[in-house]
């Protein structure tokens, strides 16, 4: 039983791996370049507070999240490091952001004017980064003239225009053409903007670009997926050594032997072709163990693979352990983990789902406890029920 949960299903997050990955990126960039650790989406499912704390300990200079709510969560946890909200912030949130020294992204003149008004009313400094559109075509300032206009709209003794950034759409592609075009377009706007105002921090590199394009690192790089030990694309693995931080584990709750031609689970999509040993696991698609893995994926038991059989249910799922000797109720089943330790990589699971491992990590639900490990020992725990972080 996992102490802190009444169900033997959990994730382990290696803080050593997080630390290793941040250090690897710090060593990969010039010592003058800052490292921004992206911990949005609850740290890509790993736990934003815990990852942020470890990343800062390992040398990260700045943090980033997607929305103001995530930033407030970090501030409430006592994290006072520089912190950027990468996306849009509603005017209703400006007062809170300014008071908590949360840096905001601005990409329209209207937003700039709202920020200026809020800061001057509070008589407190608003920290701002401009978002530049260079080819992602999501949000951002598209022209150099518009960039200057917005910068002027922000002009106030209570507004600090701290930075400007863009986001690459195709940096994980082996063909650099589009990324180079974006970089050139971004630099054109920044060069023009800097003739009108001072911008201390300019940044454009995501994880893929940080690994593959050292000439684009500029003042700061933004590393998200790489901090968690996951590569944007396979070809980048030879350029930096990362360790997958998250593993997903469970234990069987029931093991039985069934005859040949026995149907398993909803829809009768799997029928045994021989007398088989079937183990039921207390994990299902409500936990992020996707139904798309039904009859497709494998898990690791006793260092061997066992196939997932039948449709994955909301709370339970079944595996065929016929070819794995002596499986018992106390045996740990690993759904994914660090591949160098003999486990199935999250990337493989994502490929079977027809998606990317970014999504696979984020899908792991809140009712699956996160156990934080250091040197193979549990040091912290986060789950629906707060208890001591002890495994057995």
Curated annotation (Swiss-Prot):
Q: Which InterPro entries match?
A: Ala_racemase, Ala_racemase/Decarboxylase_C, Ala_racemase_C, Ala_racemase_N, Ala_racemase_pyridoxalP-BS, PLP-binding_barrel
Q: Which one Pfam family would you cite for this protein?
A: Ala_racemase_C
Q: Which reaction does it catalyse?
A: L-alanine = D-alanine
Which residues are involved in binding substrate? 138, 314
Write one Gene Ontology MF term: pyridoxal phosphate binding
Top-level lineage group: Bacteria
* Cofactor(s) listed: pyridoxal 5'-phosphate
Keyword terms, alphabetized? Isomerase, Pyridoxal phosphate
Its pathway, per UniProt, is:
Amino-acid biosynthesis; D-alanine biosynthesis; D-alanine from L-alanine: step 1/1
Modification N6-(pyridoxal phosphate)lysine occurs at: 40
Q: Name one GO cellular component term.
A: cytosol
Give the main EC class: isomerase
Name the Gene Ontology biological process terms. D-alanine biosynthetic process; peptidoglycan biosynthetic process
What is annotated as the active site? 40 (proton acceptor), 266 (proton acceptor)
Q: What is its EC number?
A: 5.1.1.1
The answer to whether UniProt assigns keyword Isomerase to this entry is yes
Q: Which HAMAP family match?
A: Ala_racemase
Task performed by this protein: Catalyzes the interconversion of L-alanine and D-alanine. May also act on other amino acids.
Q: NCBIfam families, per this entry? A: alr
The record's comment on protein family reads: Belongs to the alanine racemase family.
The name under which this protein is listed is Alanine racemase 2
Which source organism does the UniProt entry give?
Answer: Oceanobacillus iheyensis (strain DSM 14371 / CIP 107618 / JCM 11309 / KCTC 3954 / HTE831)
């Amino acid at each position: 039983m996992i102490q802190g949960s009444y169900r033997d299903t959990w994730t382990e997050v290696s803080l050593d791996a997080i630390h290793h990955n941040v250090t690897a990126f710090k060593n990969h960039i010039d010592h003058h370049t800052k490292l921004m650790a992206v911990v949005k989406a609850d740290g890509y499912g790993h736990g934003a507070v815990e990852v942020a704390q470890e990343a800062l300990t390992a040398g990260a200079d700045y943090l980033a999240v997607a929305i103001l709510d995530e930033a407030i969560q970090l501030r409430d946890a006592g994290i006072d490091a520089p912190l950027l909200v990468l996306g849009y912030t509603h005017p209703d949130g400006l007062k809170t952001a300014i008071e908590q020294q949360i840096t905001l992204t601005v990409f329209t003149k209207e937003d700039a004017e709202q920020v200026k008004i809020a800061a001057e009313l509070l008589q407190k400094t608003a920290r701002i980064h401009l978002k530049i559109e260079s080819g992602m075509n999501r949000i951002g300032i598209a022209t150099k003239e518009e960039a200057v206009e917005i910068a002027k709209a922000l002009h106030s003794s209570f507004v600090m225009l701290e930075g400007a950034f863009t986001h690459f759409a195709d940096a994980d592609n082996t063909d650099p053409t589009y990324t180079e075009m974006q970089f050139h377009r971004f630099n054109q706007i920044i060069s023009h903007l800097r003739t009108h105002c001072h911008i201390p921090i300019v940044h454009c590199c995501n994880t893929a670009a940080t690994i593959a394009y050292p000439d684009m690192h500029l003042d700061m790089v933004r590393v998200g997926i790489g901090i968690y030990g996951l590569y944007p694309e396979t070809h980048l693995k030879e350029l930096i050594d990362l360790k997958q931080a998250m593993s997903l584990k469970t234990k069987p709750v029931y093991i039985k032997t069934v005859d040949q031609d026995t149907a398993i689970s909803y829809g009768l999509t799997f029928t045994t072709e021989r007398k088989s040993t079937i183990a039921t696991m207390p994990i299902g698609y409500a936990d992020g163990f996707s139904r798309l893995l039904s009859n497709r994926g494998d898990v690791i038991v006793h260092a061997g693979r066992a196939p997932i059989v039948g449709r994955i249910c909301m709370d339970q799922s079944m595996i065929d352990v016929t070819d794995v000797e002596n499986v018992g109720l106390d045996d740990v089943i690993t759904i994914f983990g660090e591949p160098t330790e003999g486990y199935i990589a999250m990337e493989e699971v994502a490929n079977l789902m027809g998606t990317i491992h970014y999504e696979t990590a984020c899908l792991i639900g809140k009712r699956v406890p996160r156990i934080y490990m250091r040197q193979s020992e549990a040091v912290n725990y986060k789950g629906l029920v707060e208890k001591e972080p002890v495994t057995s």
